[in-house]
Design a protein with these regions (language model features):
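A low-complexity, Ser/Thr/Gly/Pro-enriched, surface-exposed linker/loop concept
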Residues: 4, 29-68
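Solvent-exposed beta-hairpin/edge-strand motifs
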Residues: 52, 552-564, 669-685
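Short, well-ordered beta-strand segments enriched in hydrophobic/aromatic residues
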Residues: 26, 34-36, 73-80, 533-536, ...
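A surface-exposed beta-strand-loop module
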Residues: 70-72, 78-79, 688-708
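Accessory, solvent-exposed terminal regions and/or long lumenal/extracellular loops of proteins
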Residues: 589-683, 712-781
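Hydrophobic or amphipathic alpha-helical targeting/insertion segments
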Residues: 74-92
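Surface-exposed beta-strand/loop patches in extracellular or lumenal glycoproteins
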Residues: 35-37, 41, 542-555, 659-676
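Catalytic-domain carbohydrate-binding cleft regions of carbohydrate-active enzymes
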Residues: 2-5, 9-10, 80, 92-582, ...
Length: 781
C-alpha cells in the first residue's frame, strides 16, 4: 500500500470544543474559526480529508445559550444562531462581532461569499485574466471553506470518497486580520513545506526537441555567459513521442528516446556535476501501452494480459496501479538521476468524486519526500490544501502584455488560499507576438516571483535565451538572472518564514494595510517578503519618455528606490516611471536586505563567502537571516539551519550576530547615510570604509562571531544623485532637443518646488514626458 500519511497532525478536536446534537455538530476551534456539520444520519467524520489535517486547537472561551428551538454560541468574535434543523438560510446565521459593515457582517447559510479571491487551477491558453476560485480573505470580515465533498484520508495512507450528503464547512471570522486567518488555515490544513534551495534559483525550461548534445551545449553557453541556472527542466521530448499509430498519440510516455539521449544516466550525472537539479515532464493520462520498455513488467505485476497487449490504464482509484506506477515508471528514473517530476495533467475527473490531479499531487509529493527532503512536485493547483504540494505550475499562457499584466495580481491573490509557490511560464508559452520589451519586463517580474522559470513553446522563434535578444535587452536580462541568484540568502529566509511562520513570500498590500483603500485598489503591487515592495511594470513604455508607468501607492513612512537609492515620502498615491533596465522596487527605512556578495555568475548553492547587506537608514530595523547549514544533506534527518541576526539602530550601531557560520566577509551599504567615527567591537575586524557613487557609506568587515559597529551618522547629500538620474532620463527621452534644454534649465533653477512643478507642467509637453521629471524632483533630499 502506498504510504501517504500525515502522522504529525491530530484530526480529533478537543472534546471541550464540541457542541453536538442528534444531527448537528459545531467545533469551536478558535474564537474565529468554527467547524459546522449537519448529518441526516447523525454520523460525523473525525478523520483527515484532502483539505483538512489538524483540528487539535486549544479550546477558546465560548458561551452557550439554548432553548428547544434555538442554539446560540457566543465566542469573543462570533455569534452563531441555529434552529437545530437541517442547515438553511433562515435557520443558521453567523454574526461577526465588531464593526466591519452595517449589514454585510452577517452570513446566512447558503448566501454567496464576497471574498477577495483565491487562485485558479491553470492559466492554460489564458490571454489575460481568468476567473478565480474562492479565497479566505474578505473585506466583510468572514469567509467559508466548504469541506463537504472532500476525499477522506484513511489511516493506511489511501483515500475514500465521502458517502452520504452531510454538510461540513469551516467559518473563518477574522475580520481584517488576514495574517491570523492564514496562520490558522495553515494550522488546520498543514503548512507550506520548506523548499530546497535549488528551487529558488533560475529554472531553464523549454518545450523543444533537445538532444543530450544540444542540451549540454546550452548549459555550457549559460556558464560561459555567466548565467546561473539551478534547475534543468526537460520537456516531453525526453521520451519517445513517435509511437505506432494504433496506440494513439505520443503525449504520454516513459521510455527514453535513445536517439536523442543515448546515455540518460550519464547525461543527468553531467547536469548534476554542473550544479543543476533535473525534472522531467510527464503526461500520465494514457497509462502504459505495449510499446513502452517497462510495459511487460508493469502489466505482469497488475495481472494483465501483456502477451495480448492489454493496456495498463491510468487508474488513480487503484492502490495497486499507483504502487506499480511509482515502482516501474518513476523510481528507476530517479535512480538514474531525476530529482523531481513535472506532472502535466490537463484532463478532468475520470471517476465521480475523485480528481486525478489531486491524487497525482498527493502521492507524488509523499513518494518523492520519502526518498529525501530535497524532493518537490511540479504540478497544477488542485483545490484548497494544494499548498502542501509545491511547486505550482500555472500552465500555458499567451505571450502578450495582457497575460503579463494579470500575473502579479494572480500570484499575490493566491496567498488568500495559502498557495505561495506558483511557477509561471516566464515570457509566456504560446501564441502572442515577439516584443523585446515585453520579454524583458517578464524577466523582471520573474525575478520577483516565487519561482523564476523561463519557458516557451517549440517554435524556433520563441527561445528565451538572453543572447537571442538585441541590446540593451540582452544585457538587462542577464543582469536580472544574476540578481535572482544573488537574492538566494533573502529568498531562503523567506522560504523559512513561509514554512515555519505561516507568511507566504508574496502578500497583497492589504495584509499589512487592511484599512487603507489603496491597498485593495492597486491590484498588481505586492510585498515580496518582509523587506521589499514591488511595483512591476506590465504596460509598454511611452514612445517619448521611453519609460513604463505604474500607478501605485506608498504606505506611511520613508521609502527607498532600491535601484537608485532615491528616497520617497510615503502615505500617498504616486505614479512611477522606469526605463527598461529598472522596475519599481522599494524598501522602507529600517529595512535590511541580505544578498550574496558574489557576482551571481555561477550557480553555486553554497552559502556565500561574502554577504552583501543593504541597510536602508532612517529608522531602526532587524532581520534574522536563515541559511542551510553546510552539513545539510539529502537525508530523512531533514535540514539544519544557521541564523545570523542583523540589527540596525538608526544613527548609532549595526550588530551582526552570526551563529555557526564561521569566518565570513560582510559588505555593508548604508543607503541614504554617510558614516563617520566608526568603531568595531567583537570577533571581527574592519577591512575598508568607502562611499559609492550615491554617497552611501560602504563598510567591509570580516567576522567569525558577534560584532558591533558603532558610528556617527549624517544624511548623505542626495541632490547630485537626483540630478544625475534626471539628467539620464532627459538624455534618453525621445523629444525635441529644445524641450530638453527647457526642462533641464527648470530642474536646475533655484526656486520653490511647487513653482518649479507648475512651470514644468506649463511647458505644454506630453504628461508622460514631464511626469517622470516631477516624480524625481519630489523625492526627499
Amino acid at each position: 500500500m502506498i504510504k501517504a500519511v500525515y502522522g504529525d497532525y491530530q484530526p480529533l478536536a478537543a472534546p471541550g470544543a464540541i457542541i453536538q446534537g442528534p444531527h448537528y455538530r459545531f467545533t469551536i476551534l478558535t474564537s474565529r474559526l468554527i467547524r459546522a456539520e449537519y448529518s441526516p444520519t447523525g454520523t460525523f467524520y473525525d478523520g483527515q480529508t484532502q483539505t483538512v489535517l489538524n483540528r487539535d486547537f486549544p479550546v477558546p472561551h465560548y458561551e452557550i445559550r439554548e432553548r428547544e428551538d434555538l442554539l446560540e454560541i457566543i465566542t469573543d468574535h462570533v455569534l452563531i444562531q441555529y434552529d437545530k434543523q437541517a442547515f438553511s438560510r433562515e435557520g443558521l446565521v453567523f454574526k461577526l462581532r465588531g464593526y466591519f459593515s452595517i449589514y454585510h457582517s452577517d452570513w446566512h447559510y447558503g448566501d454567496p461569499i464576497q471574498d477577495l479571491g483565491g487562485t485558479a487551477q491553470t492559466l492554460d491558453h489564458a490571454n489575460g485574466a481568468v476567473p478565480l476560485e474562492r479565497g479566505l480573505m474578505s473585506r466583510f470580515g468572514f469567509s467559508v471553506l466548504d469541506d463537504s465533498q472532500s476525499l477522506q484520508l484513511t489511516q493506511d495512507g489511501w483515500y475514500q470518497v465521502k458517502q452520504g450528503n452531510s454538510q461540513d464547512f469551516y467559518y473563518f471570522g477574522y475580520g481584517h486580520d488576514y495574517r491570523a486567518c492564514l496562520a490558522d488555515f495553515y494550522r488546520l490544513t498543514g503548512p507550506q513545506p520548506l523548499l530546497p534551495k535549488y528551487a529558488l534559483g533560475n529554472w531553464w525550461s523549454r518545450f523543444y526537441r533537445y538532444s543530450e548534445a544540444t542540451y549540454r551545449q546550452l548549459i555550457e553557453r549559460f556558464e560561459a555567459e555567466g548565467l546561473p541556472f539551478t534547475v534543468a527542466v526537460i520537456d516531453m521530448d525526453w521520451h519517445v513521442v513517435s509511437v505506432p499509430p494504433q496506440y494513439g498519440s505520443g503525449w504520454t510516455g516513459y521510455t527514453w528516446n535513445e536517439e536523442l539521449f543515448p546515455d540518460p544516466a550519464g547525461f543527468m550525472a553531467w547536469l548534476h556535476q554542473h550544479g543543476l537539479r533535473i525534472t522531467l515532464n510527464v503526461h500520465p493520462a494514457d497509462g502504459v501501452r505495449p510499446f513502452e520498455s517497462m510495459y511487460q513488467q508493469m502489466a505482469q505485476e497488475l495481472g494483465l494480459d501483456w502477451e495480448g497487449g492489454e493496456y495498463v490504464v491510468f487508474d488513480p482509484t487503484s492502490p495497486r496501479f499507483l504502487e506499480a506506477y511509482f515502482k516501474h515508471l518513476h523510481h528507476p528514473k530517479e535512480e538514474q538521476g531525476v530529482d523531481f517530476w513535472w506532472i502535466d495533467w490537463q484532463q478532468g475527473q475520470t471517476v465521480k468524486g475523485v480528481d486525478p490531479l489531486w491524487v497525482l499531487n498527493h502521492y507524488h509529493y509523499h513518494d518523492i519526500q520519502a526518498r529525501g527532503p530535497q524532493g518537490i512536485t511540479f504540478s497544477r493547483y488542485a483545490g484548497p490544501g494544494s499548498h502542501r504540494y509545491p511547486v505550482g505550475f500555472s500552465g500555458d499562457s499567451h505571450m502578450t502584455w495582457e497575460s503579463l499584466d494579470f500575473q502579479p495580481y494572480f500570484t499575490a491573490t493566491a496567498s488568500n488560499i495559502g498557495y505561495g509557490w506558483w511557477s509561471h511560464d516566464i515570457g509566456g508559452h504560446i501564441f502572442g507576438y515577439r516584443d523585446n520589451e515585453l520579454a524583458l519586463r517578464w524577466y523582471q517580474l520573474g525575478v520577483f516571483s516565487p519561482i523564476m522559470r523561463l519557458h516557451s513553446s517549440s517554435s524556433e522563434f520563441l527561445g528565451k535565451e538572453p543572447w537571442r535578444y538585441p541590446e540593451p535587452y540582452a544585457s538587462s536580462m542577464k543582469d536580472y538572472l544574476r540578481l535572482r541568484h544573488r537574492l538566494l540568502p533573502y529568498l531562503y529566509t523567506m522560504n523559512y518564514r513561509a514554512a515555519y511562520q505561516a507568511q507566504p513570500l508574496i502578500e497583497p498590500l492589504y495584509y499589512q494595510h487592511p484599512e487603507e483603500e489603496a491597498a485593495y485598489e492597486i491590484a498588481n503591487q505586492y510585498y515580496f517578503g518582509s523587506q521589499i515592495m514591488v511595483m512591476p511594470l506590465t504596460q509598454p513604455r511611452h514612445k517619448g519618455s521611453l519609460c513604463s508607468r505604474f500607478d501605485g501607492w506608498l504606505p506611511e513612512g520613508t521609502w527607498y528606490d532600491i535601484q537608485t537609492g532615491l528616497r520617497y515620502s510615503g502615505g500617498r498615491s504616486l505614479s512611477i516611471y522606469r526605463p527598461l533596465e529598472r522596475m519599481g522596487l522599494f524598501a522602507k527605512a529600517g529595512a535590511i536586505l541580505p544578498l550574496s556578495g558574489e557576482d551571481g555568475t555561477d550557480n553555486s548553492l553554497a552559502n556565500p563567502s561574502v554577504l552583501a547587506i543593504k541597510v536602508f537608514t532612517g529608522a531602526d530595523g532587524h532581520f534574522d537571516l536563515v541559511e542551510e547549514a553546510e552539513t545539510a544533506t539529502d537525508t530523512l534527518a531533514g535540514t539544519a539551519f544557521l541564523t545570523t541576526g542583523l540589527t540596525f539602530v538608526d544613527g548609532k550601531v549595526f550588530k551582526l550576530e552570526p551563529q555557526g557560520t564561521g569566518l565570513r566577509t560582510y559588505e555593508l551599504t548604508f543607503v541614504g547615510a554617510c558614516l563617520t567615527d566608526l568603531e568595531l567591537a567583537g570577533q571581527g575586524r574592519l577591512v575598508d570604509v568607502s562611499h559609492n557613487d550615491q554617497g552611501d557609506s560602504l563598510v567591509r568587515l570580516e567576522a567569525d562571531g558577534p560584532v558591533t559597529l558603532s558610528f556617527k551618522q549624517a544624511p548623505r547629500d542626495s541632490q547630485q544623485v537626483r540630478l544625475d538620474v534626471i539628467f539620464s532620463y532627459i538624455e534618453q527621452a525621445q523629444m525635441e532637443n529644445q524641450a530638453k534644454d527647457q526642462i533641464w534649465a527648470l530642474v536646475k533653477k533655484d526656486m520653490p518646488l511647487a513653482y518649479k512643478m507648475l512651470e514644468l507642467q506649463g511647458l505644454g509637453l506630453d504628461r508622460e514626458v514631464i511626469e517622470p521629471v516631477i516624480e524625481l524632483l519630489v523625492t526627499e533630499p
